[in-house]
Design a protein with these regions (language model features):
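Boundary/linker segments of alpha-helical solenoid repeat arrays
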Residues: 82-85, 141-149, 216-220, 247-255, ...
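Alpha-helical linker/edge segments of TPR/alpha-solenoid repeat scaffolds
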Residues: 78-97, 158-176, 231-238, 261-274, ...
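TPR/TPR-like (Sel1-like) alpha-helical repeat modules
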Residues: 135-139, 241-246, 264-288, 292-316, ...
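"A position-specific structural signal for the A-helix of alpha-solenoid helical repeats
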Residues: 73, 97, 109-112, 116, ...
C-alpha cells in the first residue's frame, strides 16, 4: 500500500491546501475548475491563502505591482469577507517589497466567545438574555457574509461539496465557506428556541441552515420536524429535499419516516405506507415507532378499502408512480459514483475516501454492506 503506484505523491493532500487545475472532463464531474472548488474547511483555505502571499512575496521574478495583482487574485478567488478586509495590508506590503503579515482570523473565535457567554447566561436562568445575545452574534455574522460578493455555504463533507457543485451551484458562482460554528450556532438556537418558545420561533434559524447547507440532509430534516410540530404538513417537501441529497442510509430512512407521517396526515395512504416500508427496508429497526405507526395506517386504510403497498417492490413502484425518490436510485448516487472514480484516478484520495464510503453505502441491500473488498479499497486510500 505504500508503493508510489498506489499512494502517489500529493495524493493525501487536502483540497484546501492543494493547487490543482482540473481538466474539462474532471471539472465537469466534480463541478469545480480547481481543487479549491472542493474545499470545505474555511480555516485551511484561509491559511493556504496566507501561504500563497508569502510565496508571492519571495518570488524574485515578479515586480511589486504584479505581486500585488497576484495577491488580489488569490483574495478574490477565496472571496472571504475577513480576508478581503485585509487586502490593503497584503498589497501594501508587496508593493513596498516586504513580506506579508501572518494574519490571525478572528471572526469564528469572536462568535465562539459570544456563544459561550450566551450559554453562561442560559445556565444562570437568563434564557431571554442568552437568546438575545446569541441571536445578535449570529445575525452580525450573517450580515457580514451577506454583504460580500460570494455565496456563503457550509459543507459537512467533500461528498456533499461535490453534490452541491453539481446540483445547486450556479454558473460562475463564487462559493464562500462560512465558519463552521456559524452553522452550528444557528442549529443550537433552533434547538433551544423550539424547546423554550415553540417551533415557530426556531423556523428562521432552520431556514438559514437550509440556505447555508442545501446539500446537507440534517438541515432539511430538522426543518421538517419543526414544521410537523406545528402541524404544517407542507413539511413533506422538506423531507423530500433531505431524501434527494441523502448519502447515508440513516438519513434516507429518517427522511422517508418523516415523509410518511406527513403524507398520512394529508390522507395519502398509499405513499405514506410506501415511505414507511422503504424506511424500514433501508434501516431495519432503526426507528422504534415505525412498525406500530405502519400497522395503524394499514388498519385505517383497510377500513376504508384503500389499497396500500405491502412489499418493498410495491412500495418502490408506488413512489415511482408518484414521481417520488426511490432511494438509493437518485441523482446524487450517480454523481458521487462518478466523482469517486475521478478522484481516485486523479490521485485525490482525501475527497475520494468520503465519496467512496457514500458509494458503498448507497445500495439496495439492508445495512451498510461495506464488504471486505470495499473495506480494503478504502484502507488503500488512507495509505
Amino acid at each position: 500500500l505504500a508503493d508510489s503506484r498506489f499512494s502517489p505523491t500529493g495524493s493525501q493532500e487536502e483540497p484546501e491546501l492543494a493547487d490543482r487545475q482540473f481538466s474539462p472532463a474532471t471539472a465537469h464531474v466534480l463541478g469545480a475548475q480547481n481543487s479549491a472548488g472542493l474545499a470545505i474547511q474555511r480555516v485551511d483555505l484561509l491559511q493556504h491563502g496566507v501561504n500563497e502571499f508569502h510565496d508571492i512575496a519571495r518570488n524574485t521574478s515578479l515586480g511589486s505591482v504584479e505581486k500585488a495583482q497576484r495577491a488580489m487574485q488569490v483574495i478574490e478567488s477565496i472571496c472571504d469577507p475577513e480576508l478581503t478586509d485585509l487586502a490593503s495590508q497584503v498589497t501594501s506590503a508587496l508593493i513596498d517589497g516586504k513580506d506579508t503579515p501572518d494574519f490571525t482570523f478572528t471572526l469564528a473565535d469572536d462568535l465562539d466567545k459570544e456563544r459561550l457567554r450566551a450559554r453562561d447566561m442560559l445556565f444562570s436562568c437568563q434564557a431571554d438574555q442568552a437568546i438575545e445575545a446569541a441571536e445578535a452574534a449570529v445575525a452580525h455574522l450573517d450580515q457580514v457574509y451577506a454583504a460580500g460578493h460570494g455565496v456563503p455555504r457550509y459543507f459537512n463533507s467533500y461528498a456533499e461539496r461535490v453534490v452541491y457543485n453539481r446540483l445547486f451551484a450556479t454558473l460562475d458562482e463564487r462559493t464562500v465557506l462560512i465558519p463552521d460554528n456559524l452553522f452550528y450556532a444557528h442549529m443550537e438556537l433552533a434547538d433551544v428556541l423550539s424547546q423554550i418558545k415553540g417551533a415557530e420561533a426556531a423556523i428562521p434559524h432552520l431556514n438559514r441552515m437550509v440556505a447555508y447547507a442545501p446539500a446537507y440532509p440534517l438541515s432539511h430534516l430538522k426543518l421538517a420536524i419543526q414544521l410537523a410540530r406545528n402541524e404544517d404538513w407542507d413539511s413533506a417537501p422538506a423531507c423530500l429535499n433531505a431524501l434527494r441529497v441523502a448519502l447515508d442510509r440513516d438519513d434516507a430512512a429518517f427522511a422517508y419516516y418523516r415523509f410518511a407521517y406527513a403524507e398520512w396526515m394529508l390522507d395519502r395512504f398509499d405513499t405514506a405506507a410506501a415511505a414507511y416500508i422503504m424506511s424500514d427496508h433501508i434501516a431495519p429497526g432503526a426507528i422504534g415507532s415505525l412498525e406500530s405507526e405502519l400497522q395503524e395506517l394499514v388498519s385505517r386504510a383497510d377500513s376504508q378499502c384503500i389499497p396500500v403497498p405491502e412489499s418493498v417492490e410495491a412500495a418502490a413502484h408506488v413512489l415511482a408512480t408518484h414521481d417520488l425518490p426511490v432511494w438509493p436510485h437518485i441523482e446524487v448516487a450517480d454523481i458521487v459514483r462518478d466523482a469517486a472514480r475521478v478522484c481516485v484516478d486523479e490521485d485525490m484520495f482525501v475527497p475520494a475516501r468520503t465519496l467512496s464510503v457514500a458509494v458503498a453505502r448507497m445500495n439496495d441491500g439492508e445495512g451498510d454492506n461495506i464488504d471486505i473488498i470495499q473495506a480494503q479499497f478504502l484502507r488503500s486510500l488512507s495509505a
